[in-house]
């Protein structure tokens, strides 16, 4: 499977002693291939018609690129340097040559070249040369067309580094014939050492982030027809961009207008979901529509939230009233960058408003849901403790004594061998007196337990009766639910705060 062409266009190829103009296509056989496939057509029409290429050549072991070499009467040439050969491409303009060079370099990877001078005393021929670095391959080339005079792999080098006015490296035994120390005189020794460090560590210094392709130059010559086609293409792209922008603005207009409609709409959608869940737990299916209508009224989510929390339980302190949330207070910028956050806040407030609506339906079915009359006042102050300084101990007026402790059951129980006397007998009155004295020292709930114990422990042959209450004590004082417990707090007459009452 062949990939799309890396670069194609009109170039000049050397055929014997002449330059011939051909339509050349360069592509990779596969995305991971390290070679290039060169397809040669006579002209562009054969390429468009899908005819077979005139010739093809696979360029393997590519070591580098060298543009701008004057060769056989052409100044604008590009040499594709391989280990065994060099392909010379001629161009009519400098721009076309640079465009082909940039596109081929991008396809090959890390391709660099440096002009150096080989020092004498090594296996290499001394004199000027070109150092080519293509990925992990290092070669030295000279002459026109370029010919490789030495080759190394970066992984086979023992050491390398920049020295004053040059660069030095040493090839190990795995380099074979090219083992040894070599010194290259160059003013770019630091840059060469830096590139070696990056490539050895797997870093691409010239590549951008993954997935971002740089803008590569167009290799086609800027003729009149090409300029017209480019202008038409730019106009078409502009129209497509304007159309997309208009569609985006039309789709995002309700959410980016800056009003409360987007907030209320998102709240209504979320409240429908919350109400559908709450309607399955209650016995009033009409709460769905009523609570949804309450949540659709956007300016009152805070009051509904306060009412919903007040209905949950009386033990929870009422929360502070929240101000109505407007879009200006949220800091919403646009529908694209803050829509998610706005939607999450609105769904939270709508769920509370739907819960408040269902609670109002349960407790006040006759009131209209969401009406301001059925909701508590938003500015109600919270009760606070008394701040008055503690004075002298005030005299407490004695009231009816409330029992707090129980007496041992063995003292309260009647003997089993005696039958309970009648209500009019003196023994009964004594029992009433003892019961009144006992009730003065034990709580009312324990009195009920004591009397139930008397009934259970009575003889089987006798009739089980409860002992009568004291003359000054009513029957309700002995029941388990005698009345409301004593108030622990009272309003301070001075500051109006809550004041802790002392135990009776």
Swiss-Prot record:
Changing residue 32 to A: Reduced stimulation of MUSK autophosphorylation. GO terms for molecular function: phosphatidylinositol binding; protein kinase binding; signaling adaptor activity. Changing residue 77 to M: In CMS10; results in a decrease of branched, c-shaped and perforated AChR clusters. Residues 331-341 have a biased composition (Polar residues). Gene3D superfamilies: Pleckstrin-homology domain (PH domain)/Phosphotyrosine-binding domain (PTB) (2.30.29.30). It is a peripheral membrane protein. PROSITE patterns: IRS_PTB, PH_DOMAIN. Residues 4-109 form the PH domain. It comes from the Eukaryota. Changing residue 30 to W: Reduced stimulation of MUSK autophosphorylation. Keywords: Cell membrane, Congenital myasthenic syndrome, Disease variant, Lipid-binding, Membrane, Synapse. Residues 263-279, 288-310 have a biased composition (Low complexity). The keyword Cell membrane applies. Changing residue 171 to D: In CMS10; results in a significant reduction of AChR clusters. Residues 210-229, 249-351, 411-483 are annotated as: Disordered. Probable muscle-intrinsic activator of MUSK that plays an essential role in neuromuscular synaptogenesis. Acts in aneural activation of MUSK and subsequent acetylcholine receptor (AchR) clustering in myotubes. Induces autophosphorylation of MUSK. This is Protein Dok-7.
